[in-house]
C-alpha cells in the first residue's frame, strides 16, 4: 500500500510532454492516499503547517519519533519530532492553548499528522503475536488479538488526514519533555497509580498516553476523581474550539471541520526546511 519515495510524500512519474494534458483526475486513484495539492513554502503539502510555527508555546513530546511507544521503536515516516497539522486544526489547537493559559496550563502534544506508512506498521505489529515486549507498560490487560475488535488499532487512522491530535495538559511552568525518554528499570503499567507510572504530565489523567485499556475511555468511572476532572477540563476546552473526542482514548481529538475528510496522506514527518 505504501508507494511513497519522495521527501514531500508525492510519488512522481515522468511522462512525455505531449501526454501531460491527458493526466486527469482519474489518474490520481493510483496515488492511494495523496491529493494533487502543490507543495507549500515550508515543504509541506498546501494546507499543512508546523504547529511550532503557529503556536511555539505548545509543548511537543512526539512519541513516535522515539522508542517510548507501544511498539518500542521509532515509527516509519517520523523523521523528526515535529507536530504537523492542517492549518485549520493548528489554529484551533492554538486557541485551546490560549484558552487554558489563563488557568496556568499549557497544551502538550504527543502525535499529530501520522503518515499512512506508520499506520501500516501499527497493523503489521498488531498481527505479530510474538512481539509482546511493550505489553507490560502499554496493554497489560488486553490481548493483541483483541486490538482491532476493541478499536485500539485500525487499518486507517484519522491522524493521516491531518486534523487529529493526541494531547494532554500540564502546568505552564513544567520543564520541557525529553522526547522518547523513559526511566531505566522495569516497565510500569500505564494503568498503575499516578505516582507509579511514567509521568506523561504532572497532572493525573487516569492512565498514561496510548494506554490500551478500558481505563483510557474518557468517561471511565474507575479512574480517580482528579483524573476525571482533568479529562473533563481537556475535553470541554477541545469541544469549545471545534474538536470531538474518541470513545476509547481520552487524549484523542479530531477537528470537526477538517479540510481533508476523505484523504489519507503519507508524506513523511520532517523538520522545517528539510
Please annotate each region the language model reported.
Residues 24-35:
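Bacterial N-terminal signal peptides
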Amino acid at each position: 500500500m505504501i508507494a511513497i519515495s519522495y521527501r514531500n510524500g508525492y510519488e512522481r512519474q515522468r511522462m512525455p510532454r505531449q501526454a501531460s494534458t491527458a493526466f486527469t483526475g482519474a489518474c490520481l486513484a493510483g496515488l492511494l492516499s495523496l491529493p494533487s495539492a502543490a507543495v507549500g513554502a515550508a515543504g509541506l503539502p498546501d494546507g499543512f503547517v508546523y504547529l511550532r510555527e503557529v503556536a511555539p508555546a505548545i509543548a511537543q513530546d512526539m512519541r513516535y519519533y522515539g522508542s517510548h511507544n507501544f511498539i518500542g521503536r521509532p515509527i516509519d515516516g517520523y523523521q523528526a519530532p515535529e507536530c504537523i497539522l492542517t492549518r485549520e486544526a493548528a489554529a484551533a489547537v492554538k486557541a485551546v492553548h490560549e484558552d487554558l493559559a489563563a488557568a496556568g496550563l499549557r497544551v502538550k502534544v504527543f502525535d499529530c499528522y501520522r503518515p499512512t506508512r506508520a499506520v501500516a506498521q501499527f497493523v503489521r505489529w498488531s498481527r505479530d503475536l510474538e512481539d509482546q515486549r511493550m505489553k507490560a507498560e502499554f496493554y497489560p490487560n488486553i490481548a493483541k488479538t483483541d486490538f482491532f475488535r476493541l478499536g485500539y488499532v485500525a487499518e486507517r487512522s484519522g491522524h493521516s488526514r491531518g486534523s487529529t491530535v493526541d494531547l494532554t495538559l500540564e502546568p505552564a511552568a513544567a520543564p520541557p519533555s525529553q522526547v522518547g525518554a523513559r526511566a531505566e528499570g522495569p516497565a510500569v503499567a500505564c494503568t498503575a497509580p499516578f505516582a507509579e507510572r511514567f509521568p506523561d504530565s504532572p497532572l493525573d489523567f487516569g492512565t498514561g498516553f496510548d494506554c490500551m485499556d478500558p481505563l483510557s475511555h474518557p468517561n471511565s468511572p474507575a479512574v480517580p476523581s482528579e483524573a476525571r476532572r482533568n479529562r473533563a477540563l481537556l475535553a470541554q476546552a477541545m469541544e469549545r474550539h471545534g474538536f470531538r473526542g474518541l470513545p476509547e482514548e481520552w487524549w484523542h481529538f479530531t477537528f470537526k471541520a477538517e479540510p481533508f475528510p476523505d484523504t489519507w496522506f503519507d508524506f513523511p514527518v520532517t523538520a522545517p526546511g528539510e
